[in-house]
UniProtKB/Swiss-Prot annotation:
Its EC number is 4.1.1.50. The gene is speH2. Catalyzes the decarboxylation of S-adenosylmethionine to S-adenosylmethioninamine (dcAdoMet), the propylamine donor required for the synthesis of the polyamines spermine and spermidine from the diamine putrescine. The modification Pyruvic acid (Ser) is found at S65. NCBIfam families: SAM_DCase_Bsu. GO terms for biological process: spermidine biosynthetic process. It catalyses: S-adenosyl-L-methionine + H(+) = S-adenosyl 3-(methylsulfanyl)propylamine + CO2. Binds 1 pyruvoyl group covalently per subunit. This is S-adenosylmethionine decarboxylase proenzyme 2.
Amino acid sequence: MEYSTFGKHIIVDLWGVDFSLLDDMYFLEHHLVHAADLSGAHVLNVSTKEFDPHGVTVLVLLSESHLSIHTYPEKNFAAIDCYTCGTTVEPQIAIDYIVSILKPNEMHIKKLIRGIGEIVNTD
């Protein structure tokens, strides 16, 4: 079987997110896995890490690549990264779901197309 190198990569910075949501590893793990499912991705594994005194990293390893979040609750900030290879998964669905759950006051997003030569910014 031949695979395409084409991929969609979305990176998002969220500001003004509630501290308690960003410091809850189980809440974030549940919602990132659900977001991946909604996007059509296939979850292979989930890795989580709580930091002292605050902060969480959740990495969802996908058959199609990955979805991750790194949080800084004391700054009400989260960094989200979703990269999917091929054309069968829509990472924007995962991002939209996570944003709807976290309800940031401010959001900055970059969308990239990868694997076609030069990285293309779609904004």
